[in-house]
Amino acid sequence: MAWWKAWVEQEGVSVKGSSHFNPDPDAETLYKAMKGIGTNEQAIIDVLTKRSNVQRQQIAKSFKAQFGKDLTETLKSELSGKFERLIVALMYPPYSYEAKELHDAMKGLGTKEGVIIEILASRTKNQLREIMKAYEEDYGSTLEEDIQGDTSGYLERILVCLLQGSRDDVSGFVDPGLVLQDAQALHEAGEKIMGTDEMKFITILCTRSATHLMRVFEEYEKIANKCIEDSIKSETHGSLEEAMLTVVKCTRNVHSYFAERLYYAMKGAGTRDGTLIRNIVSRSEIDLNLIKGQFKKMYGKTLSSMIMADTSGYYKTALLNLVGTDL
């Protein structure tokens, strides 16, 4: 299923929240779990991983009203490491969390281009608008300004272009003439010439609807005798290549894209915990169940089995709760 439909797939939600919800006893449970010496991590997991984000925000309000403390700050003071990072991520409203991930990717020395590419290429126009709004409210500068200040060249161009969210046309109408024109233009901008006309690639990939692009990719393959992915790999490199390939992957099947992100976050030595946490938290109330299905199809194992083998302790328990049972 293509990326633009993922936001409306109710069956994809792995964290549905509590049907008999009352924030006051939940807040009290959390207070007791962190009161005095020691922390009852399991109690924290049982509450926060089994509530929706809206419910968590209500728990935080109740916690403040009952005990005069900020819940997120209290959690930060009681927890540590990857487990703290995961639990704190759950406490952010969704758009503020995405804004934070983008801000963290750009602050300090170096830029985590992969995080920026992942978020901007896989979100819809409405989602991007809300993320930009949250970013400006939380950090006092616009996301576009910060991206322009932190990146350069064609990578900056494609990221700013993605921010405009022009790929959201879900009308289903596709102009066959324009499809052929775009496929030929991509061929002429890459395979047919010495060098590459990067702006032509950027313009078509970032401003056409997903339904249109799917047809363009088909026509391109007929003209070039190779898939668009192979042409991008041979014509570009580095972060620009990653950005273009991500747009193509998300256009073809967003669930496959996120399955791949999760798989490579755990494959091999070490774990890319930032990628693992961000994608499980941000997709848990959208389409994580659908991602799990693609994961099993693509890699022959379940997402939860890989998490069990690659993580440990309360961090593992919390992740598995968010992922839910494998289908």
From Swiss-Prot:
Ca(2+) binds at M266, G268, G270, D310. Annexin repeats lie at residues 21-92, 93-164, 177-249, 253-324. GO terms for molecular function: calcium ion binding; calcium-dependent phospholipid binding. It comes from Mus musculus (Mouse). This protein is an anticoagulant protein that acts as an indirect inhibitor of the thromboplastin-specific complex, which is involved in the blood coagulation cascade. Belongs to the annexin family. It comes from the Eukaryota. SUPFAM superfamilies: Annexin. One of its GO terms (biological process) is blood coagulation. Keywords: Annexin, Blood coagulation, Calcium, Calcium/phospholipid-binding, Hemostasis, Metal-binding, Repeat. InterPro entries: Annexin (IPR001464), Annexin_repeat (IPR018502), Annexin_repeat_CS (IPR018252), Annexin_sf (IPR037104), ANX8 (IPR009115). This is Annexin A8. A pair of annexin repeats may form one binding site for calcium and phospholipid. The lineage of its organism: Eukaryota, Metazoa, Chordata, Craniata, Vertebrata. Pfam families: Annexin.
